Amino acid sequence: MTEEHVVLLDEQDKPSGTLEKYAAHTLNTPLHLAFSCWLFNEDGQLLVTRRSLSKKAWPGVWTNSVCGHPQQGETTEEAIIRRCRFELGVEITDLTPVYPHFSYRATDPNGIVENEVCPVFAARATSVLQVNSEEVMDYQWSEFKSVWQSLLATPWAFSPWMVMQASDEQARKRLLNYCQR
């Protein structure tokens, strides 16, 4: 895969430039565009992934299925499809926004900051996973309600963006409705 960049955003969340992804994520990460996707199988189970230990931010932490950054000139939907293929080796369908205006800023235990405008989507897996171990060290298909209970009981074991996304009542209802269809 070619070197990835993040699309930097100004105070009005408008693109203002790009920066190499690894260089962007520091103790003072600039605001940039991202996405988050919750992937479900045909049985309505959610794919929860554990981030590789080689990840710069939140290594080894459990999170939602796939996250990433649209590249300049790429739609969010195109970026989600690209990252699902790269990280999980999976094809997807029925890509649906569930929390289109999510944004957050969080600092990991090593001081690395995430500072993202991060629309959240749900999608359905249509092929068998072929996980990229450089991105994902473990994964689990689980019932959404069980994951929600785990997020409530042990939020520290999950990425802060996953906890924040699921804690939004409207987003949680949309995810629950999505997994039940």
UniProtKB/Swiss-Prot annotation:
Pathway: Isoprenoid biosynthesis; dimethylallyl diphosphate biosynthesis; dimethylallyl diphosphate from isopentenyl diphosphate: step 1/1. Keywords: Cytoplasm, Isomerase, Isoprene biosynthesis, Magnesium, Manganese, Metal-binding. It is found in: Cytoplasm. Residues 30-164 form the Nudix hydrolase domain. GO terms for biological process: dimethylallyl diphosphate biosynthetic process; isoprenoid biosynthetic process. Its main location: cytoplasm. Homodimer. Catalyzes the 1,3-allylic rearrangement of the homoallylic substrate isopentenyl (IPP) to its highly electrophilic allylic isomer, dimethylallyl diphosphate (DMAPP). This is Isopentenyl-diphosphate Delta-isomerase.
